[in-house]
């Protein structure tokens, strides 16, 4: 008999619905069909002896005392079991099907009964977000705010989204379908049941693509910058959707509503409420996706990204009104995704059932700010946002941490469909560990005090996305592999202190460089790619040229990491002219490189632009024209004020120990040439 219940629960439900209160004809049944639905509606006026409870116990074959072991039988739990027998039964289903994940989705139920009009429709899977219910927000009235539940009731689409709707649509929640258990690893997946009476195919299932990244920010309370001109969100909203009618047309848009009625402030290292929110703000709160309207096949074919959505605090913003969402600082907001089926002519008809679907992901909540308050959020933005160049210019002067490890990307955490450089730099072992020493601040050398963002001090170049410039980004839908030129095992970037002593070391490094072309690396023609993808110069030399790591962003660059070469002969000439020591030892340099390239022996002693010390294929940028920057980098590395002088026996290139004053003067000249070819990017 129990097997019959499991195989055909809809048949049993149709027989038992007569015993359920008539005002909730489909609510309990819809939750029962979704066996793994963790968000259960609290229906206080269900009959205490509802046969649904008996059905669920028969399906799970559990006794009345076989509840969650972690519930501790608190008074709230007892009250919950008395108030909602449907919840009690389905929670056992969660325990049977999902095992250890069940305790994450215990419903926080108030110990006092609430009416059906004010009871929260569902819950957030985060204990800190449980709270009293508030009047729900309507899209037509921005003055209302959102209650603590994923689907908004009493709104413009109440007849379609409420649990007590005559159509009987189930509440959109966080079910974890069995077929997605391994590929998505428990990501939020909204689903409408197709077995519900009256439903037809075309009900959406939505997946938040970059949920791991959102959760990282959510742990520290996400903050979003708002400006007068408008600022894009990071992380941005990105969804995958399925279950639509491929031939029907849909509008997909996002609106941003108040998540609670409080005004917030950052005090004592945490966000605390301070007063009531201002609910009289007028302005656009809706952002329509640029592809709307479009067919269901189009929406399901690709990721739906809202990366161009901008947040502003300009209440009178009339231009670009379609891209601007007007918010208030120090208020907490909740984005929502709406999928609306439209007619052939593109007009919306919300009066028909099933045409509007709304999805809310609580981990996308954020507090609007004009400046970041939490340094943890700032560091997360630096680590994951490849376009946060303003932070990298000023972060080490604004905040206390100056050592280099505050600017490193986080390895092995590249989320899906989010352009982050984290996995690009996931190197093995000591190559990462020895890069950024604690005395980096002592070795810093800035071109000027208080350098701000600008073309002359663009420090965001090394933080681009591996080999790819932003214009060369591949399909963001898959996790990004490592994108280094060479593998950690064959890495020749960590030169020894005497790397320039013998031709053998240079020949080995030249062979490594030549192997790039054989691998078909597209970003190696540096003249075409510019300097937007500088993976070779990102990490400092771990062991060579002294005990300290060289400054990463100043002119005294290490020749061992081969920074981005100048893309024109004019830039090379400027760099050569800025260093008077380059011409003095040009003859010696050409003579020492002769075993590598016989053509360099008859080169002009004073003209390094003609010294071809390596044979390069046609696919690589010619070193004859502008490769004097390599020797220039070696010389500038030697005269860096932060370096320890190398003994005469270990470096044949060394001629003398320069005075500190001369070092500063020459480095200042070198910086101008070094940043000259970055100004165009």
Curated annotation (Swiss-Prot):
CDD domains, A to Z: T-box_TBR1
Tissue: Expressed in the developing and adult cortex. Expressed in the olfactory bulbs.
Gene Ontology MF annotations: chromatin DNA binding; DNA binding; DNA-binding transcription activator activity, RNA polymerase II-specific; DNA-binding transcription factor activity; protein kinase binding; RNA polymerase II cis-regulatory region sequence-specific DNA binding
Keyword set includes Iron: no
Source species taxonomy: Eukaryota, Metazoa, Chordata, Craniata, Vertebrata
SMART domains cross-referenced by the UniProt entry: TBOX
Record carries keyword DNA damage: no
PANTHER family associated with the record: T-BOX BRAIN PROTEIN 1 (PTHR11267:SF88), T-BOX PROTEIN-RELATED (PTHR11267)
Quaternary data: Homodimer. Part of a complex containing CASK, TBR1 and TSPYL2; may modulate gene expression in response to neuronal synaptic activity. Forms homodimers. Interacts with FOXP2. Interacts with FOXP1. Interacts with BCL11A.
Protein name per its UniProtKB record: T-box brain protein 1
Residue(s) carrying Phosphothreonine: 408
Region (Disordered): 43-83, 108-127, 447-483, 597-655
